[in-house]
């Protein structure tokens, strides 16, 4: 039985708020968020109507989900588990739809801005540099770059690995493909030049950028989230995005297409880390303590980090500066009001250790 994924999505038709007045902006954002919740509720309801109860599957930070064939065929890449599952409930010639979806998924590029994950439009372009190249091996142990190899592998999977299950009124046909064991490192490697560029530009440690990308999206450039966070570093348009644009002397906030571009996303996410480090949390003098604060703030905001120690920002920094870094870590991972932020610091800190040379 498929688990019901949380609605980690962002509607492409949401209206961007451009008011310069904070109160007006917040009011408009609330309206947009409410509209988004309604739209996504409808989207999930439509998927449930087509696929049935317990079969709702929607894109998230670490899950690529694309529907085609009037929403009767879908491709799901679970970047955390390292699996690709292609499924169809098409009552007529299901293997034809599976075959096409397998080939398209294996050969898709890494341009999220060109793909609408919330429609059944077959808008995925076959790329000469497939996003999954090197992350999947065919039945002969070869990486898949060309259409002929993807086609042969699709035929092999349908002939040898085809699964069938009953779910409600539907027969679901599927094949599952395992990513290579080091798929996470393969994806991370693709973005190293951009990470190094941003690291030098903003003075942020490469290992921290890598760790945040791993925890936020598992290096999934198609990453979306219910909190309106987009792309590899899960940048939120109306908060971090606005701060970064302001720092760059730009008005407003970045668009969805801007943040779905990997270079822009890594630049914006790293720029926001630098704002946290060099502006919002600059009064924390110990580098390790400040790093813990920056990591937690990337998830839950700088204000909530400081309020753990005092309602007065200056006093909070003074209190932190009198504490050992280990005590700051302990406090943030046990006293922060958000359980998500508490876990986030633990996860990113652990992941960062894995990227130190």
UniProtKB/Swiss-Prot annotation:
Keywords: Cell outer membrane, Cell wall biogenesis/degradation, Lipoprotein, Lyase, Membrane, Palmitate, Signal. Its main location: membrane. It is a lipid-anchor. The gene is mltC. PROSITE patterns: PROKAR_LIPOPROTEIN, TRANSGLYCOSYLASE. InterPro entries: Lysozyme-like_dom_sf (IPR023346), Murein_transglycosylaseC (IPR023664), Murein_transglycosylaseC_N (IPR024570), Transglyc_AS (IPR000189), Transglycosylase_SLT_dom_1 (IPR008258). A lipid is attached at residue 17 (S-diacylglycerol cysteine). It is found in: Cell outer membrane. The keyword Electron transport does not apply. It comes from Photorhabdus laumondii subsp. laumondii (strain DSM 15139 / CIP 105565 / TT01) (Photorhabdus luminescens subsp. laumondii). Gene3D superfamilies: 1.10.530.10. This is Membrane-bound lytic murein transglycosylase C. GO terms for cellular component: cell outer membrane. Residues 1-16 form the signal peptide. A lipid is attached at residue 17 (N-palmitoyl cysteine). Belongs to the transglycosylase Slt family. Coiled coil: none annotated. It holds the Pfam family Mltc_N.
